[in-house]
Every structure is written in C-alpha cells, then in structure tokens.
Amino acid sequence: MKLVSSEKDTYVYTNNKTVDRTKPSLVFIHGAGFDHSVWTLFARHFSRHDWNVIALDLPGHGRSEGPVLESIEAMASWTIELIDTLGLNSVALVGHSMGSLITLETASRLGDRVTHAVLIGSISPMPVSDPILDATANKPGAAHSMLTSFGFSKQNLMGGNPNPGMWMVSDSMRRYEDEAQSALDSDMRACNAYQRGLEAASEITAPTLMLHGDADRLTPMRATKPLLDNLSNARMDIIPGAGHSLMVEDPNHVLDQLKIHLL
C-alpha cells in the first residue's frame, strides 16, 4: 500500500488490505538497514485474525522515498504522522532493535493512544561500537558481514533454519545489500546518539513485552535491566539459544509471545 506523507511516497505493508478503522491496529517498525519484509510472517498472522497490520518502510528504506531520517526523534515524529494520516485513534506498536527505540519514543508521545508495546532486542542506551560505525560509513561490505555475524547466536551461525529451504545468515546479508549504504550508516548513528530511551520508557503506561535472545551479542542481556526497570507495566520473555535476529532465529516463539501479549 502506497500513500503520500509530507509530499513523499511512503510504503506500508498491509497484506493487501485496506485499513479498517473499526478494527484494532498493529504497527510494525523495522530495525537499522532493513524494511517491512522482516515482519511478513507476523503481519500475515494478525491480518488473518482481523487486525489492521501496518508494517512500514521508514523514509529511504525499502519502497519509501527518502531522505533518510537522522534521529530516533525524527523517526518517531514521522511514525506519528503516518498513524495520523491513516486515521488511527489507537495502535499497538512492535519494534525491533532501532525500531524498538522508535517504539519507545512514539509510545511516550502518544500516551493512551498506544494499547500495547513490544520491544524486541532492545536496550537503552543502544551504543554502537566505533569499528561498526567506521564500517557502515566506509566499508559497507564489511559492515554487512560484521552485523550479520554478531546478529545471530553462535549456534545459529553454524546453519539450520526453522523455515525449510532458507539459510538465515544469507537472508540477512541480502537484506542489508538491498538497502542503501547511507540508510544503514544513518540508522546506526541514530541508535548511538539516542539518549532519551529511559525517560521515554518511564512515560509509557501501556502493557509492554520485552523479547530478548539469551545469546544476543549486539544488545546483550546484561544491558536490558535499566530499560525493564523504567517500564511500569512490562514483562520480559527470554528466548533460549537466540541472538539479536529473533524473528528469523525463532519465529514461532516470537509469534507465540505476540499472540499472548496482544490477543
């Protein structure tokens, strides 16, 4: 589904359905260097269960026109504008990694318009190492390899996939390669710079689910406590053997937890 927001073409995946304002609505927000396609399995499930699903492409990602937004705050403002353009009075928000920071900022501003929040692979602050920032700016191939390597648990890097016929590591590499280099670099710098996450978390009253892999090396488990402590109505679910790429490492567990939290 294409729509115009701020005079730019914006793409949102809706499972080929028109948004029905009488139904509950679920907004999926992707992580750095990715697009709406990471949410296809989950969006289709909730669409079949009478939810509006809006898996967005942030500006400069996927099928949405640029320019790329350079801060989490700007991405949250854009997301709110999109929600308002669609005429949605209330929404549930699901975000992965950078998308979880956008979820925090968006939910803190929308208040009781947010019915539920889900933070997947989330910590705050979310620092990015200098070697990764150097690679995203100057050596995109190396950046893709680094982020893919660290994005999976060590056991999942060895092979195997819950989706038959797919190789999750190669799939991640192809997704990075399909996006503009400038988008990944800008996204990483936005994550590194965002410092309002704990304050935003303290302002959120909606029931919140944190989903985390116990083998996450990009946003390690030991760093989740400050965020969890600042959320007033939250629970944590830990996925054994999973790294940062939870939606492909254990999609069934993620879907089951989304259903428990949202349905």
What kind of region is each of these model predictions?
Residues K8, N15, T40-R44, R48, ...:
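Active-site loop/oxyanion-hole signature of alpha/beta-hydrolase fold enzymes
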Residues K23-G31:
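Short beta-strand element of the alpha/beta-hydrolase
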Residues G31-F34, S97:
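Active-site glycine-rich loops that stabilize anionic/oxyanionic intermediates
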Residues L101-M146:
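Flexible "cap/lid" loop of the alpha/beta hydrolase fold
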Residues D134-E203:
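Conserved alpha/beta-hydrolase catalytic His-Asp/Glu region
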Residues I204, M210-H212, D216:
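Short beta-strand/loop motif that positions the catalytic acidic residue
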Residues K225-H244:
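Catalytic histidine neighborhood in serine/cysteine hydrolases
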Residues A242-L255:
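Catalytic histidine-centered segment of alpha/beta-hydrolase-like enzymes
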